[in-house]
């Protein structure tokens, strides 16, 4: 049975790279009717925080990536926090010590640093000198009993190669003489990342480890641990890195990089999932838009690229604009409540159909939910500021007097619909031998304070006759010299 896992460290928000890894695991599990497990790798006790674990889970759920086993729902192979599994790890570390496949290392940090410095001076890569490798277990235990601190190192093979069979990259060879007798238990009593990964993946019956390319260098060490414990390793697949447009490492200076930030910036979960799918994988046929259900059907690890994916926020924003136009208006209404409330606008106070009509208009010209708010505040608040350039260009006495002369006709217009309003405005322009655009732009500034809005006549229909007349009258009173 296919069993995959996403194992984030709770040291910050869910990064776009982590979200992509979680998504690929989720797709693979769903495609093969398998299980998707969430495991929290909180072995870094200094940096790990429970609130970050909760934030990561919240972001995954928001994206629609649900797990079958995990910290919050439990499962057959828990606990799902690594910090709660130390007894299991110690059992296997003791097994390796007893079998002579690992050993206690009493070298202090100062001694290790000295060795590093010598290697640096000799211009060779550092490898531990192995001076504790032949200390007997009995002697080591006696020294520990007498108060000495010790780490535990694995006895790694000293020649030959370790081969990683990678579904995406093929066979990747690592020379064993470069691998060193690496530490599996630190002197403070905490097991290391590579060791706990192996034990947990085995115990949780993980069939495929799908993770980021930066973990590829950890894989030979993990294979050595599997071999020492006589355990069968899972299959590995290392997905490509995500780089910034300049091919540097993606970081804060490139803008939003966490799922939480994308949410706050008004991106839709459907758009983010769609975009993440394209970072290293393609549905084929030169397509950009693909939903989760279709992706599950088409996803294959063998078709994931080896090459780094380039993060392009403009492409994400374009995709977001597509989904924003397609989303059901009821759904959009619900999602917009949060973003309007951040601006102090409670849309529940307004007639729901009125709000939905405003949203239908505005969403055609914007790309994010934040932009929806910014482009529509005048529908819900008539205390808007007037754009200064718009005032200077359009709110001239001549233009305002023309608009003012339209008021009686607007008041009597039935139905107060976009086609009827447009017909009235254009007839007025023709009768006065003025450009219709002048009247249109003047009314726009009068009723919104802006020079750029959705179509004026549709906007007037949504605002309604009473509100339009009130705003025009107020603007004329403010800017016409009495």
UniProtKB/Swiss-Prot annotation:
GO terms for biological process: glutamyl-tRNA aminoacylation. ATP binds at residue 252. It catalyses: tRNA(Glu) + L-glutamate + ATP = L-glutamyl-tRNA(Glu) + AMP + diphosphate. A motif ('HIGH' region) lies at residues 8-18. It is an enzyme of class 6 (ligase). Its EC number is 6.1.1.17. One of its GO terms (molecular function) is tRNA binding. Keywords: Aminoacyl-tRNA synthetase, ATP-binding, Cytoplasm, Ligase, Nucleotide-binding, Protein biosynthesis. Coiled coil: none annotated. It holds the Pfam family Anticodon_2. Gene3D superfamilies: 1.10.10.350, Glutamate-tRNA synthetase, class I, anticodon-binding domain 1, HUPs. Its main location: cytoplasm. InterPro entries: aa-tRNA-synth_I_cd-bd (IPR045462), aa-tRNA-synth_I_codon-bd_sub2 (IPR020751), aa-tRNA-synth_I_CS (IPR001412), aa_tRNA-synth_I_cd-bd_sf (IPR008925), Glu-tRNA-ligase_bac/mito (IPR004527), Glu-tRNA-synth_I_codon-bd_sub1 (IPR020752), Glu/Gln-tRNA-synth (IPR000924), Glu/Gln-tRNA-synth_Ib_cat-dom (IPR020058). Monomer. This is Glutamate--tRNA ligase 2. It comes from Caldicellulosiruptor saccharolyticus (strain ATCC 43494 / DSM 8903 / Tp8T 6331). The gene is gltX2.
